[in-house]
């Protein structure tokens, strides 16, 4: 509107050419974003587009390995990516993630300092590459009635329920699903055996491989979204990320099928993993300017709260908590207690030889070797 007032005296043709140029410029503002499926508020992207006049091409992926492969191959085509901070740490070392211009991210002030410190100490020295998004842990989501109906002696609350072949053999009758995520399951298995979740000892991976081989015949599927089908009694047990367990419980209530789901964390010191997912900008991103604008927008407390209310994941945004539904903030599945967090472990970047060991262990597990 201001432009047309300034140039009221020019010819109609000139005004039209300016309008066309402005329209083309607006259309040129395209931001390409990728994230896990169902991991953002329902209106978050639309509201960003409406406010800033930027078209967002939003893509989803279903495994950390798939986005890793795209980023490592180069020319991913993305301007903004959500990734597990532990996995992304090695991408940073490889120069695949761009440093952030924090002068354009004034909303970093809303992020929990404890989480920023966690990132700096474990994965992103100096907090130069990552904007924390969500955090949480993993555990077991289960249909208690179906479990006990199938196997009255099931050790509910113990990780033996999923790692002991004697128990798994019985529970296979009502369906057991594992996360399709070696970065979660392999450290979980190491911890269950009382070993270092970040072990670099080949013998430890042999022990894990042997344990997983014994339970493999009883794993129905490897699926990060199996929790969505638990209200239909397709599975009685599933390893899930904590908030997905909460979503499963809510889904069961909404489905009104009479199914009641519960969730538990691995108990004991160093047996549950603390993870943080972060926003980051690939080094080959074409639109870094608007990528920073998007990250700053995502850190608004009300936006972060909307994302948590939809996904039921714990936001890293400290100032968003007053806007988040109590149903979410009061659940240990979504927001583990401080006592639980203190006992959790974090994963670190492993040497390439150990990464290959982990990959081989996982591949053999899924293949039943």
Language-model segments: residues:
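Early extracytoplasmic/lumenal segment of secretory-pathway proteins
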Residues: 27-91
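Sec/Tat signal peptide C-region and signal peptidase I cleavage site
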Residues: 20-26
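Alpha-to-beta junction loops
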Residues: 54, 74-81, 96-98, 169-174, ...
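Mature extracytoplasmic/periplasmic domains
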Residues: 277, 282-343
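Bacterial N-terminal signal peptides that target proteins for export
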Residues: 1-11
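Extracytoplasmic ligand-binding site segments that recognize negatively charged/polar headgroups
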Residues: 88-217, 225-229
């Amino acid at each position: 509107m201001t432009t047309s007032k300034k140039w009221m005296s020019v010819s109609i043709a000139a005004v039209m050419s300016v309008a066309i140029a402005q329209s083309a410029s607006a259309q040129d503002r395209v931001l390409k974003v990728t994230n896990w499926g169902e991991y953002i508020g329902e209106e978050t992207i639309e509201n960003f587009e409406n406010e800033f006049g930027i078209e967002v091409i939003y893509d989803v992926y279903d495994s950390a390995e798939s986005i890793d492969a795209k980023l490592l191959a180069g020319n991913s085509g993305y301007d903004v990516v959500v990734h597990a901070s532990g996995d992304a740490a090695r991408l940073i070392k490889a120069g695949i993630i761009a440093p952030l211009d924090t002068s354009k991210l004034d909303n970093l002030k809303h992020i929990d300092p404890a989480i920023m410190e966690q990132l700096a100490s474990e994965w992103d020295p100096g907090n130069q590459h990552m904007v924390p998004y969500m955090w949480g842990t993993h555990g077991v989501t289960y249909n208690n009635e179906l479990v006990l109906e199938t196997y009255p002696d099931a050790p509910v609350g113990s990780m033996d329920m999923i790692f002991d072949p004697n128990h798994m053999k019985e529970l296979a009758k009502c369906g057991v699903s594992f996360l399709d995520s070696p970065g979660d399951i392999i450290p979980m298995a190491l911890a269950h055996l009382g070993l270092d979740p970040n072990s670099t000892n080949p013998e430890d991976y042999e022990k894990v491989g042997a344990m997983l081989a014994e339970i493999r015949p009883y794993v129905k599927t490897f699926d990060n979204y199996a929790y969505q089908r638990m209200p239909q009694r397709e599975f009685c047990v599933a390893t899930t990320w904590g908030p997905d367990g909460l979503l499963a419980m809510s889904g069961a209530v909404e489905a009104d099928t009479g199914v009641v789901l519960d969730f538990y964390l691995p108990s004991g010191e160093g047996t549950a993993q603390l993870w943080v997912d972060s926003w980051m900008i690939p080094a080959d991103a074409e639109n870094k300017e608007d990528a920073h604008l998007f990250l700053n927008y995502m850190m608004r407390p009300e936006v972060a709260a909307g994302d948590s209310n939809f996904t039921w994941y714990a936001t890293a945004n400290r100032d968003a908590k007053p806007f988040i539904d109590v149903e979410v903030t009061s659940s240990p599945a979504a927001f583990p207690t401080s006592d639980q967090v203190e006992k959790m472990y974090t994963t670190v970047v492993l040497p390439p030889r150990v990464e290959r060991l982990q990959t081989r262990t996982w591949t053999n597990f899924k293949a039943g070797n």
